[in-house]
Amino acid sequence: MDPCECSKTGTCNCGTSCKCSNCQCACCKKSCCSCCPSGCSKCASGCVCKGDTCDSKCCQ
């Protein structure tokens, strides 16, 4: 299963609340980690955004 197409197309839409453009997430979930910013993609346990932006705070 490949929930993100960022690595292939540069854009992706993971679910209804995760939209990516040029591998930047407007909001990210665990299933969309591959296109989160560097601060999120480093999280081994996945990334979860509690707000409307995807930044280092979404790493848990």
Swiss-Prot record:
InterPro entries for the chain: Metalthion_dom_sf, Metalthion_dom_sf_vert, Metalthion_vert, Metalthion_vert_metal_BS
Residues given in the record as a divalent metal cation 5 binding sites: 33, 35-36, 49
Region of interest (Alpha), ranges: 29-60
UniProtKB keywords: Metal-binding, Metal-thiolate cluster
GO-annotated molecular function: metal ion binding
Pfam family, one: Metallothio
Residues that coordinate or bind a divalent metal cation 2: 6, 12, 14, 25
Record-listed a divalent metal cation 3 binding positions: 14, 18, 23, 28
Positions of transmembrane segments: none
Superkingdom assignment: Eukaryota
Binding site for a divalent metal cation 1: 4, 6, 20, 23
Residues at which a divalent metal cation 6 binds: 36, 40, 43, 59
Binding residues annotated for a divalent metal cation 7, in chain numbering: 49, 54, 58-59
Record-listed a divalent metal cation 4 binding positions: 32-33, 43, 47
SUPFAM superfamilies: Metallothionein
Segments of this protein annotated with the region Beta: 1-28
Family to which this protein belongs: Belongs to the metallothionein superfamily. Type 1 family.
Its job: Metallothioneins have a high content of cysteine residues that bind various heavy metals.
Domain description: Class I metallothioneins contain 2 metal-binding domains: four divalent ions are chelated within cluster A of the alpha domain and are coordinated via cysteinyl thiolate bridges to 11 cysteine ligands. Cluster B, the corresponding region within the beta domain, can ligate three divalent ions to 9 cysteines.
Protein name: Metallothionein
Source organism per UniProt: Ictalurus punctatus (Channel catfish)
Gene for this chain: mt
